[in-house]
Structure formats: structure tokens, C-alpha cells
């Protein structure tokens, strides 16, 4: 059983995905949240084959610090 008076109050919260612009409502202690990525636009959930090119970033890093 929860103690009275020590827990925060949960209120409806509007969560906005800044990548897709979609919104959903959940319960939280905050009234509004902005997130970078959600299940609306993440490749795992959408099934898209968007691959991030991290090889280029690694090569830039190695060139910057003269590493092999």
C-alpha cells in the first residue's frame, strides 16, 4: 500500500516527437514532454531500412587524431 502525501501527482501529459511531429497522451508528473525519437519514426518499429552511416564518422575521427 502506498503512503499518502509522499508521492507526486500524476496528470495527463502531452508527449511530442520532434522528428515526426506526432503526439500522444500519457500520465506523468509533467504536463508536456518533447522527445527526439519515438515508435512513430524509429526504424525498428516502422520497418524501414534506414541505415546510419557511422563509417564516415569513424574515418573523420581517425583522420582528425592521426590514428590508423
Curated annotation (Swiss-Prot):
Keywords: Ribonucleoprotein, Ribosomal protein, RNA-binding, rRNA-binding. One of its GO terms (biological process) is translation. InterPro entries: Ribosomal_bL28/bL31-like_sf (IPR034704), Ribosomal_bL31 (IPR002150), Ribosomal_bL31_A (IPR027491), Ribosomal_bL31_sf (IPR042105). SUPFAM superfamilies: L28p-like (SSF143800). One of its GO terms (molecular function) is structural constituent of ribosome. GO terms for cellular component: ribonucleoprotein complex; ribosome. PROSITE patterns: RIBOSOMAL_L31. It comes from the Bacteria. Belongs to the bacterial ribosomal protein bL31 family. Type A subfamily. NCBIfam families: L31 (TIGR00105), PRK00019.1 (NF000612), PRK00528.1 (NF001809). Part of the 50S ribosomal subunit. Binds the 23S rRNA. PANTHER family: 50S RIBOSOMAL PROTEIN L31, CHLOROPLASTIC, LARGE RIBOSOMAL SUBUNIT PROTEIN BL31A. This is Large ribosomal subunit protein bL31. It comes from Helicobacter hepaticus (strain ATCC 51449 / 3B1).
Amino acid at each position: 500500500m502506498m503512503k499518502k502525501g509522499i508521492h507526486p501527482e500524476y496528470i495527463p501529459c502531452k508527449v511530442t516527437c520532434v522528428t515526426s511531429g506526432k503526439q500522444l497522451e500519457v500520465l506523468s508528473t509533467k504536463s508536456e514532454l518533447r522527445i527526439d525519437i519515438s515508435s512513430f519514426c524509429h526504424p525498428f518499429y516502422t520497418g524501414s531500412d534506414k541505415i546510419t552511416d557511422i563509417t564516415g564518422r569513424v574515418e573523420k575521427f581517425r583522420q582528425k587524431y592521426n590514428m590508423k
